[in-house]
Regions:
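Non-catalytic substrate/cofactor recognition surfaces at enzyme active-site rims
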Residues: 1-149
Length: 149
């Protein structure tokens, strides 16, 4: 992905304006409790910490570097690229993993297909399906607007 984007970039200026922003995305979360015998219980609602993703957006001229504190699944990455007002956007996973426990950032379709909980990170994910896409769209648009794109 990075190589495909880099190959398309033409440097036409000696200096480029730089802007950046950091934001946090919060959605309802879930807790997974293991019981004796191997059974697992999912807890949601009051008393459960929200699921959080730390977002970093940096604009270098007409290039955007957009970082996430977890690993963004492809469908979400494609949607972010569609929303970008810049032609060249590079998505960076795990850029602040120690600051937020985002883990794998699943899209709802992938989550729904994994009924057997075999995807890496699915069982332990604190993400509650149904919230990330809309919040990611909102934050992405707001962040690009704030940095002047």
């Amino acid at each position: 992905d990075v190589l495909q984007v880099i190959r398309k970039i033409q440097c036409t200026t000696a200096a480029a304006p730089v802007a950046g922003i950091v934001d946090w995305l919060y959605t309802p979360g879930r807790s997974i409790v293991s019981h004796e015998g191997g059974s697992m219980e999912t807890i949601t609602g009051d008393g459960v910490d929200p699921y959080e993703i730390r977002l970093h957006l940096m604009k270098l001229g007409e290039i955007a570097l957009y970082g996430f504190s977890g690993e963004l699944y492809s469908a979400l990455g494609r949607r972010v690229k569609e929303l970008s007002p810049l032609e060249h956007i590079i998505l960076i996973n795990h850029d602040a993993s120690l600051m937020a426990r985002s883990g794998y950032i699943f899209d709802d379709e992938t989550w729904a297909r994994d009924t057997s909980n075999r995807l890496p990170g699915h069982r332990s994910s604190r993400m509650l399906p149904g919230y990330v896409l809309a919040s990611l769209e909102k934050h992405t648009l707001e962040m690009f607007q704030k940095i002047g794109s």
